[in-house]
Amino acid sequence: MRLTLLLAALLGYIYCQETFVGDQVLEIIPSHEEQIRTLLQLEAEEHLELDFWKSPTIPGETVHVRVPFASIQAVKVFLESQGIDYSIMIEDVQVLLDQEREEMLFNQQRERGGNFNFEAYHTLEEIYQEMDNLVAENPGLVSKVNLGSSFENRPMNVLKFSTGGDKPAIWLDAGIHAREWVTQATALWTANKIASDYGTDPAITSLLNTLDIFLLPVTNPDGYVFSQTTNRMWRKTRSKRSGSGCVGVDPNRNWDANFGGPGASSSPCSDSYHGPKPNSEVEVKSIVDFIKSHGKVKAFITLHSYSQLLMFPYGYKCTKPDDFNELDEVAQKAAQALKRLHGTSYKVGPICSVIYQASGGSIDWAYDLGIKYSFAFELRDTAFYGFLLPAKQILPTAEETWLGLKTIMEHVRDHPY
């Protein structure tokens, strides 16, 4: 066992230059507003290099923060001095990363000459190869649309599911934040589900006889590759700009939806950096241009992780959208359908009230463009693993998410506008 762990650690060093040995994820539940303000001040202390996986919002809501080993004692002493209770959610982040890397390498060996394993995490190259396989195996149903290239010149490939004709469309994307690996895996499983079950599953057949589906499994390909090869905790794009040594923009703060407002940072080194202007990121602009040119997209759905949430506009402001009642009803039904499979509970509501105010988000942009059915999923889990969800949870996550997606898609089909 010791040799196995040593090998895994060595492989982690080779494949992922930045290690997180001794880093801990703390769970904090602030009890009042003063503690919220204190945690927000702590978040602003850049020298501590804290990574807030779940930021402070309101009293009683859980906060998760990854604390580098070098800052652990200082942070714990500070929390105790302020009377803020905490517990350790992840004892050593690197242990989970080593296990994750070992599982990926084992799966790569197992897949050689065999079938694609949808219950494993994959490289970008492997994902793109499987997308090509789906197109080749389903020529009358699935095609590949290239939106262009990422900042580092990787293709942005979309799968189009269509039975022909000029139909209204549903847009579904995943992986806009690089480190949220379960979203890319869920999207690819969903693509296979749609392709495999058309013609035999009445629900999928009915949907595709009425609607086209455009699915982008990896919205941020550069960030995804970087998260696998260099820094597992990477969130942003990989764009570079003169005058700053910090790399990347938060692509879900870069849309033209109250750009630069609350919940987005003007600091290029922040994980929530909104970028120099709306749509500055080629990955965002490519989607914007495609959606606008298509002209008949009726639903815009994006997959994130984690926290088990199903949200709709608005994020950039805390007022209800005009279609609040309908969006809330659809989301509640989708969450109920999802829960029936494995008992996974989702919280439902507008972004601003469910998590926090955040400007420049994709579904706010889509809704303001006139795409009424705009939703964001935050997939599993709520604690324990955070962004490092074990591969064994990919399948149940994808299966239950599909039930929520299907509920939304059926509503879109039955309520044309």
UniProtKB/Swiss-Prot annotation:
<comment type="similarity">
    <text>Belongs to the peptidase M14 family.</text>
</comment>
<comment type="function">
    <text>Carboxypeptidase that catalyzes the release of a C-terminal amino acid, with a preference for large aromatic C-terminal residues.</text>
</comment>
<dbReference type="InterPro" id="IPR003146">
    <property type="entry name" value="M14A_act_pep"/>
</dbReference>
<feature type="binding site">
    <location>
        <begin position="305"/>
        <end position="306"/>
    </location>
    <ligand>
        <name>substrate</name>
    </ligand>
</feature>
<keyword id="KW-0732">Signal</keyword>
<keyword id="KW-0378">Hydrolase</keyword>
<keyword id="KW-0862">Zinc</keyword>
<dbReference type="Pfam" id="PF00246">
    <property type="entry name" value="Peptidase_M14"/>
</dbReference>
<keyword id="KW-0865">Zymogen</keyword>
<keyword id="KW-0121">Carboxypeptidase</keyword>
<dbReference type="GO" id="GO:0004181">
    <property type="term" value="F:metallocarboxypeptidase activity"/>
</dbReference>
<keyword id="KW-1015">Disulfide bond</keyword>
<dbReference type="Pfam" id="PF02244">
    <property type="entry name" value="Propep_M14"/>
</dbReference>
<feature type="binding site">
    <location>
        <position position="356"/>
    </location>
    <ligand>
        <name>substrate</name>
    </ligand>
</feature>
<dbReference type="GO" id="GO:0005576">
    <property type="term" value="C:extracellular region"/>
</dbReference>
<protein>
    <recommendedName>
        <fullName>Carboxypeptidase A2</fullName>
        <ecNumber>3.4.17.15</ecNumber>
    </recommendedName>
</protein>
<dbReference type="GO" id="GO:0004180">
    <property type="term" value="F:carboxypeptidase activity"/>
</dbReference>
<keyword id="KW-0479">Metal-binding</keyword>
<feature type="binding site">
    <location>
        <position position="235"/>
    </location>
    <ligand>
        <name>substrate</name>
    </ligand>
</feature>
<feature type="disulfide bond">
    <location>
        <begin position="246"/>
        <end position="269"/>
    </location>
</feature>
<dbReference type="InterPro" id="IPR000834">
    <property type="entry name" value="Peptidase_M14"/>
</dbReference>
<feature type="binding site">
    <location>
        <begin position="252"/>
        <end position="253"/>
    </location>
    <ligand>
        <name>substrate</name>
    </ligand>
</feature>
<feature type="active site" description="Proton donor/acceptor">
    <location>
        <position position="378"/>
    </location>
</feature>
<dbReference type="GO" id="GO:0008270">
    <property type="term" value="F:zinc ion binding"/>
</dbReference>
<dbReference type="InterPro" id="IPR036990">
    <property type="entry name" value="M14A-like_propep"/>
</dbReference>
<keyword id="KW-0964">Secreted</keyword>
<feature type="binding site">
    <location>
        <begin position="177"/>
        <end position="180"/>
    </location>
    <ligand>
        <name>substrate</name>
    </ligand>
</feature>
<feature type="propeptide" description="Activation peptide">
    <location>
        <begin position="17"/>
        <end position="112"/>
    </location>
</feature>
<dbReference type="GO" id="GO:0006508">
    <property type="term" value="P:proteolysis"/>
</dbReference>
<feature type="binding site">
    <location>
        <position position="304"/>
    </location>
    <ligand>
        <name>Zn(2+)</name>
    </ligand>
</feature>
<feature type="signal peptide">
    <location>
        <begin position="1"/>
        <end position="16"/>
    </location>
</feature>
<dbReference type="GO" id="GO:0005615">
    <property type="term" value="C:extracellular space"/>
</dbReference>
<keyword id="KW-0482">Metalloprotease</keyword>
<keyword id="KW-0645">Protease</keyword>
<feature type="binding site">
    <location>
        <position position="177"/>
    </location>
    <ligand>
        <name>Zn(2+)</name>
    </ligand>
</feature>
<feature type="disulfide bond">
    <location>
        <begin position="318"/>
        <end position="352"/>
    </location>
</feature>
<feature type="domain" description="Peptidase M14">
    <location>
        <begin position="120"/>
        <end position="412"/>
    </location>
</feature>
<feature type="binding site">
    <location>
        <position position="180"/>
    </location>
    <ligand>
        <name>Zn(2+)</name>
    </ligand>
</feature>
<dbReference type="InterPro" id="IPR034248">
    <property type="entry name" value="CPA_M14_CPD"/>
</dbReference>
